[in-house]
Structures are given as structure tokens and as C-alpha cells.
């Protein structure tokens, strides 16, 4: 009789690209997984700021930014899917029109009301705004994991919100107790 493996659930985990990641879209990336189930996975790259800050983006979408401390906060490349759309990863505070509560973790909101709340100071104090997201179809992420494409570890919101973006990859690796210089992108090699 065949046994079936229980499906893995990587929701609220970091995906850390292995050094040999061939896809330049994800090379050197850390992805926060907002959702992972039998239909696929959805995550946001948390360590790839782009050449636009909050003030510039808010000008483009006609929102008045009343809170100056966030004006120069960078906007991030969240992934290659729907890159014209904003995704806000934030602490689970406030109620917004279109939010996904990540079990045991944060919230991801796609509705403009969270940006309006951030702009006037009533929104979440800790947030990361991305353009686009990373998505995988059913079984696709599991296949990439089996081919040694990613490391996984329980996410730490402090890395997302308190660590500079250029240090997030190394900080996520440290959660595993691994020295990044000792990793090889090839299975079976040190």
C-alpha cells in the first residue's frame, strides 16, 4: 500500500535563494511566504529595494503623504507577477478592505486604504511596500525545493522591518545557524 506524504506548509516562512540560483529574478533574494497550500504559493521579496521611494509613489497615485518619516522609505520589488500593483506587508493592525492574514505572522494588504492610513499616520507603523509578488503554481515551489533552489526557515518580522535591506539575506541565513560562505548551490557539495 502506498503512503502519501503530508503536504508541507511554508506559510510565514522565509525562502532564501541558494547561491546557485540560476534565475536572476530571485538570485540573492529572501521571500516572505504569505500563503502556501495545495494550489500554490504567494510571497513577497523583502530585500530588493527599487529606485522609487514612498514619497514618489504617493505622488504618482495622488496620495498626500502627511507623515514625513516614511517619505524616503524605499519601495521594493516584490516579485515578477503584477509588478504594477502594490502589496503592503505589515503588522496585523487595522482593518482594510483586502487583507490576507498570514497565520502566526503578518498581514498582506492590496487595497489602497492601507496606503491612505499610512499617509495620514493612522496605519501600521511597521510595513514594507512592494510592487509585484512572487507566485508559484501547484507543486512548483515543492519542485524548486527538491532541486535545492531554496532554503526555508521560520520568518522573523524583525528582519523584514528592522534590518537594512542589504543585510536581510545574511540575517535570514543566520536564523539557520549557517555560514553563507560554506554553502554550495549544488546538491551534495559543501
Curated annotation (Swiss-Prot):
SUPFAM superfamilies: VC0467-like. InterPro entries: AlgH-like (IPR003774). HAMAP family: UPF0301 (MF_00758). One of its GO terms (cellular component) is cytosol. It comes from Cupriavidus metallidurans (strain ATCC 43123 / DSM 2839 / NBRC 102507 / CH34). This is UPF0301 protein Rmet_2743. Belongs to the UPF0301 (AlgH) family. PANTHER family: UNCHARACTERIZED PROTEIN YQGE (PTHR30327), UPF0301 PROTEIN YQGE (PTHR30327:SF1). It holds the Pfam family DUF179.
Amino acid at each position: 500500500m502506498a503512503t502519501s506524504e503530508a503536504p508541507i506548509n511554508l506559510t510565514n516562512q522565509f525562502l532564501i535563494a541558494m547561491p546557485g540560483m540560476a534565475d536572476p529574478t530571485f538570485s540573492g533574494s529572501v521571500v516572505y511566504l504569505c500563503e502556501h497550500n495545495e494550489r500554490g504559493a504567494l510571497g513577497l521579496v523583502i530585500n530588493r529595494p527599487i529606485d522609487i521611494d514612498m514619497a514618489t509613489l504617493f505622488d504618482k497615485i495622488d496620495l498626500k503623504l502627511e507623515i514625513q518619516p516614511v517619505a524616503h522609505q524605499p519601495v521594493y520589488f516584490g516579485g515578477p507577477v503584477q509588478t504594477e500593483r502594490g502589496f503592503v506587508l505589515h503588522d496585523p493592525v487595522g482593518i482594510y478592505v483586502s487583507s490576507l492574514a498570514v497565520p502566526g505572522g503578518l498581514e498582506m494588504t492590496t487595497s489602497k486604504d492601507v496606503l491612505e492610513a499610512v499617509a495620514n499616520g493612522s496605519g501600521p507603523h511597521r510595513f514594507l511596500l512592494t510592487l509585484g509578488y512572487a507566485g508559484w503554481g501547484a507543486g512548483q515551489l515543492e519542485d524548486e525545493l527538491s532541486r535545492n533552489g531554496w532554503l526555508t526557515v521560520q520568518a522573523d518580522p524583525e528582519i523584514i522591518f528592522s534590518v537594512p535591506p542589504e543585510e536581510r539575506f545574511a540575517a535570514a541565513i543566520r536564523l539557520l545557524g549557517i555560514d553563507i560562505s560554506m554553502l554550495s548551490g549544488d546538491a551534495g557539495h559543501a
